[in-house]
Protein backbone atom coordinates (compact mmCIF):
# COMPACT_ATOMS: atom_id res chain seq x y z
CA UNK A 1 0.00 0.00 0.00
CA UNK A 2 2.73 2.49 0.84
CA UNK A 3 4.25 2.54 -2.63
CA UNK A 4 0.89 3.04 -4.34
CA UNK A 5 0.07 6.06 -2.19
CA UNK A 6 3.63 7.36 -2.65
CA UNK A 7 2.98 7.61 -6.40
CA UNK A 8 -0.56 8.90 -5.82
CA UNK A 9 1.04 11.92 -4.16
CA UNK A 10 3.14 12.54 -7.27
CA UNK A 11 -0.03 12.61 -9.37
CA UNK A 12 -1.89 14.77 -6.85
CA UNK A 13 1.01 17.23 -6.77
CA UNK A 14 0.99 17.43 -10.57
CA UNK A 15 -2.76 18.11 -10.66
CA UNK A 16 -2.58 20.76 -7.94
CA UNK A 17 0.23 22.55 -9.78
CA UNK A 18 -1.59 22.42 -13.14
CA UNK A 19 -4.74 23.86 -11.58
CA UNK A 20 -2.85 26.37 -9.41
CA UNK A 21 -4.52 25.07 -6.23
CA UNK A 22 -2.66 25.39 -2.93
CA UNK A 23 -4.37 23.55 -0.07
CA UNK A 24 -2.47 23.04 3.17
CA UNK A 25 -3.89 19.69 4.34
CA UNK A 26 -4.68 16.23 3.02
CA UNK A 27 -6.98 14.20 5.30
CA UNK A 28 -7.35 10.42 4.90
CA UNK A 29 -8.07 7.23 6.85
CA UNK A 30 -5.29 5.45 8.69
CA UNK A 31 -5.47 1.80 9.69
CA UNK A 32 -2.49 -0.43 9.05
CA UNK A 33 -0.33 2.64 8.21
CA UNK A 34 0.53 1.79 4.59
CA UNK A 35 -1.67 4.53 3.16
CA UNK A 36 -0.39 7.18 5.56
CA UNK A 37 3.25 6.13 5.21
CA UNK A 38 3.07 6.27 1.42
CA UNK A 39 1.36 9.66 1.43
CA UNK A 40 3.88 11.08 3.92
CA UNK A 41 6.80 9.85 1.83
CA UNK A 42 5.24 11.06 -1.43
CA UNK A 43 4.40 14.49 -0.03
CA UNK A 44 8.01 14.97 1.08
CA UNK A 45 9.77 13.32 -1.87
CA UNK A 46 7.74 15.09 -4.56
CA UNK A 47 7.58 18.36 -2.57
CA UNK A 48 3.80 18.46 -2.80
CA UNK A 49 3.48 20.99 0.02
CA UNK A 50 0.66 19.24 1.87
CA UNK A 51 0.52 18.27 5.52
CA UNK A 52 -0.84 14.71 5.60
CA UNK A 53 -3.43 14.33 8.39
CA UNK A 54 -4.11 10.65 9.13
CA UNK A 55 -7.39 9.89 10.92
CA UNK A 56 -7.18 6.62 12.87
CA UNK A 57 -10.02 4.14 12.42
CA UNK A 58 -9.32 2.33 15.69
CA UNK A 59 -9.22 4.05 19.10
CA UNK A 60 -6.70 1.45 20.25
CA UNK A 61 -4.22 2.74 17.68
CA UNK A 62 -2.37 4.94 20.16
CA UNK A 63 1.39 5.05 19.79
CA UNK A 64 1.10 4.24 16.08
CA UNK A 65 3.65 6.91 15.29
CA UNK A 66 6.50 4.53 16.18
CA UNK A 67 5.50 1.79 13.69
CA UNK A 68 4.57 4.44 11.10
CA UNK A 69 8.04 6.01 11.33
CA UNK A 70 9.57 2.55 11.06
CA UNK A 71 7.54 1.75 7.92
CA UNK A 72 8.40 5.14 6.40
CA UNK A 73 12.10 4.69 7.09
CA UNK A 74 12.21 1.08 5.84
CA UNK A 75 10.31 1.99 2.65
CA UNK A 76 12.55 4.99 2.02
CA UNK A 77 15.66 2.88 2.50
CA UNK A 78 14.40 0.01 0.32
CA UNK A 79 13.64 2.32 -2.61
CA UNK A 80 16.55 4.73 -2.11
CA UNK A 81 14.40 7.79 -1.44
CA UNK A 82 16.81 9.38 1.02
CA UNK A 83 14.11 10.40 3.50
CA UNK A 84 13.87 9.67 7.20
CA UNK A 85 11.49 10.62 9.97
CA UNK A 86 11.08 10.24 13.70
CA UNK A 87 7.87 9.31 15.52
CA UNK A 88 7.77 12.86 16.92
CA UNK A 89 7.28 14.24 13.39
CA UNK A 90 4.10 12.18 12.95
CA UNK A 91 0.72 12.90 14.50
CA UNK A 92 -2.03 10.33 13.94
CA UNK A 93 -5.40 11.78 14.92
CA UNK A 94 -7.37 9.47 17.25
CA UNK A 95 -10.25 11.88 17.84
CA UNK A 96 -12.67 10.32 15.35
CA UNK A 97 -11.99 6.59 15.76
CA UNK A 98 -15.25 6.04 17.60
CA UNK A 99 -15.98 3.03 19.76
CA UNK A 100 -13.72 0.57 17.97
CA UNK A 101 -12.52 -0.85 14.68
CA UNK A 102 -15.46 -1.34 12.31
CA UNK A 103 -17.87 0.08 14.91
CA UNK A 104 -19.40 3.31 13.62
CA UNK A 105 -20.90 5.76 16.08
CA UNK A 106 -23.74 8.21 15.54
CA UNK A 107 -21.37 11.03 14.51
CA UNK A 108 -19.76 8.84 11.85
CA UNK A 109 -23.15 7.77 10.53
CA UNK A 110 -24.24 11.40 10.38
CA UNK A 111 -21.12 12.33 8.41
CA UNK A 112 -21.89 9.46 6.01
CA UNK A 113 -25.45 10.75 5.59
CA UNK A 114 -24.30 14.32 4.98
CA UNK A 115 -21.85 13.35 2.24
CA UNK A 116 -24.31 10.98 0.56
CA UNK A 117 -27.21 13.44 0.64
CA UNK A 118 -25.26 16.53 -0.45
CA UNK A 119 -22.69 15.12 -2.89
CA UNK A 120 -23.98 11.61 -3.76
CA UNK A 121 -20.67 10.19 -2.53
CA UNK A 122 -20.71 7.14 -0.29
CA UNK A 123 -18.21 6.35 2.44
CA UNK A 124 -18.02 3.20 4.55
CA UNK A 125 -18.61 2.96 8.31
CA UNK A 126 -15.18 1.52 9.12
CA UNK A 127 -12.60 3.68 7.33
CA UNK A 128 -13.79 6.51 5.13
CA UNK A 129 -16.85 7.36 7.23
CA UNK A 130 -14.64 7.97 10.24
CA UNK A 131 -12.06 9.97 8.32
CA UNK A 132 -14.75 12.04 6.59
CA UNK A 133 -16.24 12.78 10.00
CA UNK A 134 -12.78 13.97 11.01
CA UNK A 135 -12.42 16.01 7.84
CA UNK A 136 -15.70 17.84 8.48
CA UNK A 137 -14.76 18.68 12.05
CA UNK A 138 -11.20 19.69 11.23
CA UNK A 139 -12.31 22.01 8.41
CA UNK A 140 -15.08 23.56 10.50
CA UNK A 141 -13.32 23.81 13.86
CA UNK A 142 -9.56 23.27 13.70
CA UNK A 143 -7.92 24.31 10.43
CA UNK A 144 -7.51 28.04 9.91
CA UNK A 145 -10.01 29.65 7.56
CA UNK A 146 -8.66 29.70 4.04
CA UNK A 147 -5.97 27.05 4.56
CA UNK A 148 -7.69 24.61 2.23
CA UNK A 149 -7.98 20.89 2.75
CA UNK A 150 -8.40 17.85 0.53
CA UNK A 151 -10.29 14.77 1.62
CA UNK A 152 -8.92 11.55 0.13
CA UNK A 153 -11.57 8.84 -0.33
CA UNK A 154 -9.66 5.56 -0.18
CA UNK A 155 -12.54 3.20 -1.03
CA UNK A 156 -14.29 0.63 1.14
CA UNK A 157 -17.78 0.89 -0.30
CA UNK A 158 -18.65 -2.85 0.03
CA UNK A 159 -18.61 -2.47 3.84
CA UNK A 160 -21.76 -0.35 3.61
CA UNK A 161 -23.83 -3.36 2.63
CA UNK A 162 -22.87 -5.75 5.42
CA UNK A 163 -25.91 -6.83 7.44
CA UNK A 164 -24.56 -5.24 10.61
CA UNK A 165 -24.01 -1.84 9.01
CA UNK A 166 -27.23 -1.92 6.99
CA UNK A 167 -29.26 -2.69 10.11
CA UNK A 168 -27.53 0.06 12.09
CA UNK A 169 -28.04 2.69 9.38
CA UNK A 170 -31.65 1.64 8.83
CA UNK A 171 -32.39 1.89 12.55
CA UNK A 172 -30.78 5.32 12.71
CA UNK A 173 -32.25 6.94 9.61
CA UNK A 174 -35.36 5.09 8.51
CA UNK A 175 -37.11 3.69 11.58
Residues of each region from the PLM?
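Short, high-confidence coil segments that cap the C-terminus of an alpha-helix
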Residues: 21-23, 144-147
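Compositionally biased, low-complexity repeat tracts
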Residues: 130, 151-152
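General beta-strand structural signal in soluble alpha/beta enzymes
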Residues: 28, 122-125, 151
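Glycine-rich phosphate/pyrophosphate-binding loop at beta-loop-alpha junctions
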Residues: 2-91, 153-175
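Active-site-adjacent helical/loop segments in soluble small-molecule enzymes
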Residues: 87-146
Amino acid sequence: GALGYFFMMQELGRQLKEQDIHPRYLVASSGSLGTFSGMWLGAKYFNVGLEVVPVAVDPLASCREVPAADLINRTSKKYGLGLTCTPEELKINLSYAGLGYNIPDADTQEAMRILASTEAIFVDPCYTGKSFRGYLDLVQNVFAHGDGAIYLHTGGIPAIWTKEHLDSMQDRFWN
